[in-house]
Amino acid sequence: MTSSLPLAAVVLAGGASRRMGRDKATLPFDGPSGTTTMVERVLSVVSARCEPVFVIAAPGQALPELDAVVLRDEVRGLGPLLATGRGLRAAAEAGRSHAFVSAVDMPALTPEIIDVLAGPAERLNADVVLPWDGRDHYLAGIYRTALHTVVAALLDAGERSMRALVDAVDTQRIVLPEQPALANVNTAADLAAILPPRLGQQTAVTGASGTGNSIPN
């Protein structure tokens, strides 16, 4: 069931990809619609629920032509917090109050993950709603776009981690069993282990419970 909450999407594509040994955003991926790149695969998923979509890329990073707004990090290598703040600010300026923030290296992501989070994000007065399947998934959550000001303050204080952001604001966690759709691809072996999901398959997210539950850090 989809939520009526209008969402932007922020896809972080500018990571260093050290363990993969090459840019993960442009890594070929055999998806349900044929061979594509990782960034195009993730965009196809988030675009099913979110508009507009922003891709945060590294300076000079080569990307295919994308149906999204591409923004460049001003400095390379400062981590996801800076990129998240940039994307949230752009989403706020586009008139969206909330955005789904995603890593580029989750090719098994499905729209149903967004649905599971969007309902609680609409009902609860929380700043961040994250999936929790034994660990936090900071880069698969819904964030209030006004948090870009909090991100800026954290960066000014020398913080670089996403945990610093979620610990500083009201964060709700939605308890799920382990979700293959949330798997990150860091190595070639990780990629080989992922079976392409069917877009729109309702069983892609199973057993969501505990709406609004907070898990101790």
From Swiss-Prot:
MF GO annotations: GTP binding; metal ion binding; molybdenum cofactor guanylyltransferase activity
Chief site of localization: cytoplasm
UniProt xrefs under Pfam families: NTP_transf_3
Gene3D superfamilies: Spore Coat Polysaccharide Biosynthesis Protein SpsA, Chain A
Compartmental location: Cytoplasm
Gene Ontology BP terms: Mo-molybdopterin cofactor biosynthetic process
GO cellular component, one term: cytoplasm
Catalytic reaction(s) noted: Mo-molybdopterin + GTP + H(+) = Mo-molybdopterin guanine dinucleotide + diphosphate
Binding site for GTP: 12-14, 24, 73, 105
EC nos: 2.7.7.77
CDD domains: MobA
Cofactor requirement: Mg(2+)
Keywords: Cytoplasm, GTP-binding, Magnesium, Metal-binding, Molybdenum cofactor biosynthesis, Nucleotide-binding, Transferase
Binding site for Mg(2+): 105
Family stated for the protein in its record: Belongs to the MobA family.
Domain notes: The N-terminal domain determines nucleotide recognition and specific binding, while the C-terminal domain determines the specific binding to the target protein.
Protein's job: Transfers a GMP moiety from GTP to Mo-molybdopterin (Mo-MPT) cofactor (Moco or molybdenum cofactor) to form Mo-molybdopterin guanine dinucleotide (Mo-MGD) cofactor.
Protein name listed in UniProt: Probable molybdenum cofactor guanylyltransferase
Species, as recorded: Mycolicibacterium vanbaalenii (strain DSM 7251 / JCM 13017 / BCRC 16820 / KCTC 9966 / NRRL B-24157 / PYR-1) (Mycobacterium vanbaalenii)
Species lineage: Bacteria, Bacillati, Actinomycetota, Actinomycetes, Mycobacteriales
Gene that encodes the chain: mobA
